[in-house]
From Swiss-Prot:
It comes from the Eukaryota. Belongs to the RNA polymerase alpha chain family. This is DNA-directed RNA polymerase subunit alpha. GO terms for biological process: DNA-templated transcription.
Length: 339
């Protein structure tokens, strides 16, 4: 973090991208500014954004590989230049781009002699490779070589205890961190009592998303962290009240949605987009992946449809209903149903 004195003027708080470039397929760079900020605010925003960018952004990577016959990870396979461990390390470096949630299967099945690169990975439709030229192995003889892979979207470091996997399956200590580095610097501007600060933020990513996309996702995650405090203040509830709150059975959600559909006359549901419902980024992304874009799309789904969405949880179901009840001018209290 760097501080410098520069000349500047006070304006309404705003941000913009002042530099953006692609150094390689796996290295994107972006530089952003936010100004004007009061003294101390730039540090607050800079520290929070840096931590969110490095620790809260989700990435997709290969987490497991299964070989046909390999007694241990340090063994070699006839006709292959690399050892099993070297192949695992190469797979760890593969950069993937996707919006999937949960575990997906992929595979490699080729015949030598030839070089194996990331382009040879057979992926599910929702996943794409950022750099198809990334090396995996070199087959030196005319052998059939097949690997079963597992792909997962997560955040941070994924570590798993090493074991003697009898079936030839080995975990890969993947790093789901699309943001490679973040720097911020603070510049002071103005004179006398009118001093303000300008925050400069530099972001490097691995190509699976742009720095601008990473900044947007990190900001959404930070907002989601503070939403519970805002909701608690609006509802006027205490922690003791929340602790003793009763959680009813699943079927109440479906009853309430059914009732809402019956009372939707006069509301242009196809003109109300889920972007307007103040959903958390997690719930919002789940619905978007299921092609649910408007309130009409949402109300056309049954509870079973929603629960089949990848990574959709009971907490998301409750959050959706609470949001609908908050924003729609429909009195459902007469049903005496509550979450």
């Amino acid at each position: 973090m760097v501080r410098e004195e520069v000349a500047g003027s006070t304006q309404t708080l705003q941000w913009k991208c002042v530099e953006s470039r692609v150094d390689s397929k796996r290295l994107y760079y972006g530089r952003f500014i936010l100004s004007p900020l009061r003294k101390g605010q730039a540090d607050t925003v800079g520290i929070a954004l840096r931590r969110a960018l490095l620790g809260e952004i989700e990435g997709t990577c290969i987490t497991r590989a299964k070989f046909g016959s390999x007694p241990h990870e340090y063994s070699t396979i006839a006709g292959i230049e690399e050892s099993v461990q070297e192949i695992l390390l190469n797979l760890k470096e593969i950069v993937l781009r996707s919006n999937l949630y949960g575990v997906r299967d992929a595979s490699i099945c080729v015949k030598g002699p030839r070089y194996i690169t990331a382009q040879d990975i057979i992926l599910p439709p929702s996943v794409e490779i950022v750099d198809t030229x990334q090396p995996i192995a070199n087959l030196t003889e005319p052998i059939d070589f097949c690997i079963d892979l597992q792909i997962k979207r997560d955040r941070g470091y994924q570590t798993e205890l090493r074991k003697n996997y009898q079936d030839g399956s080995y975990p890969i200590x993947x790093v789901s961190m699309p943001v490679r580095n973040v720097n911020y610097s603070i510049f002071s501007c103005g004179n006398g009592n009118e001093k303000h600060e300008i925050l400069f933020l530099e972001i490097w990513t691995n190509g699976s998303l742009t720095p601008k996309e990473a900044l947007y996702e990190a900001s959404r995650n930070l907002i989601d962290l503070f939403l519970p405090f805002l909701h608690a203040e609006e509802e006027g509830t205490s922690f003791e009240e929340n602790k003793n709150r009763f959680t009813p059975p699943l079927f109440t959600f479906q009853k309430r949605l059914t009732n809402l559909k019956k009372n939707k006359k006069g509301i242009p549901l196809n003109c109300i987009f889920i972007d307007q419902l103040e959903l958390t980024s997690r719930t919002y992304n789940c619905l978007k992946r299921a092609n649910i874009h408007t309130l009409l799309d949402l109300l056309s789904k049954t509870e079973e449809d929603l629960m089949r969405i990848d990574s959709f949880r009971m907490e998301d179901r409750k959050h959706i209903w609470d949001t609908l009840e908050k924003h729609l001018p429909i009195d459902l209290l007469k049903n005496k149903l509550s979450f």
